[in-house]
């Protein structure tokens, strides 16, 4: 890479010499190759902040790759996010490719649900006959699911959450929560705080994180 000076010399029969200098420049104009990490489908950890391990791309270049960057956010929202990876070599050539990150919630795309949003205040939220995605956010909320297969997050505050009918997935999140699945095959997660979890009818799964083993859990056929 770079410039090389070649000296040409011409000599006649009388011994006269003429020199000519030729500059040969080797320039890298070939972009590097980049293969992004595989697309990712990840279950949401939170309604707002979801941290995703993107992995690492594969890169190659005829010289050296100077830098690898991406435009991923610090945390991912629900749904699909396209992450663009860019490799740049020491000559300034670059190549880019994309990775698709999908954050689903309760095993489904957010578009599967009817959205119901709470506020930072104390809310009373009622679901519909459709599959509802209900976020209580802040405050001490009362949340009532309905007949759909609902996905409910209590959020911050001391919440009371009823799944009612349907196969519901309920997370108390933070605070000291009361969670009742009622009918249907429900998955109930108290989250952080001292929680009372009642699976109700049918076959239910209750999740108690290790740090919260003082939660009161009843009528749960499976405990994780």
Language model features with spans:
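Proline-threonine-serine-rich low-complexity tracts
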Residues: 1-112, 124, 129, 133, ...
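Short, intrinsically disordered, charge-biased short linear motifs at domain edges
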Residues: 45, 193, 204-208
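Glycine-centered beta-turn/loop sites at beta-strand termini
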Residues: 109-110, 117-118, 126-127, 135-138, ...
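Short, low-complexity, Pro/Ser/Thr/Gly-rich segments in the mature regions of secreted, periplasmic
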Residues: 216-224
């Amino acid at each position: 890479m770079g410039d090389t000076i070649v000296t040409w010399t011409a000599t006649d029969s009388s011994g006269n010499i003429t020199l000519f200098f030729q500059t040969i420049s080797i320039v890298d104009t070939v972009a590097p190759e980049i293969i992004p990490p595989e697309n990712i489908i990840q279950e949401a950890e939170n309604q707002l902040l979801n941290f995703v391990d993107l992995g690492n791309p594969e890169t190659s270049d005829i010289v050296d790759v100077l830098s690898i960057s991406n435009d991923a956010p610090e945390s991912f929202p629900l749904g699909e996010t396209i992450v663009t990876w860019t490799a740049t070599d020491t000559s300034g050539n670059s190549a880019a490719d994309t990775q698709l990150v999908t954050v689903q919630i309760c095993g489904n795309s957010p578009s599967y649900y009817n959205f119901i949003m709470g506020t930072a205040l104390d809310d009373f939220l009622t679901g519909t006959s459709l599959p509802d995605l209900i976020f209580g956010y802040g405050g001490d909320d009362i949340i009532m699911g309905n007949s759909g297969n609902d996905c409910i997050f209590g959020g911050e505050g001391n919440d009371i959450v009823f799944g009612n009918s349907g196969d519901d997935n309920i997370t108390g999140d933070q605070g000291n929560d009361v969670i009742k699945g009622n009918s249907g095959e429900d998955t109930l997660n108290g989250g952080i705080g001292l929680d009372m979890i009642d699976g109700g009818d049918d076959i239910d799964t209750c999740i108690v994180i290790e740090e919260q083993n003082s939660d009161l859990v009843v009528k749960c056929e499976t405990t994780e």
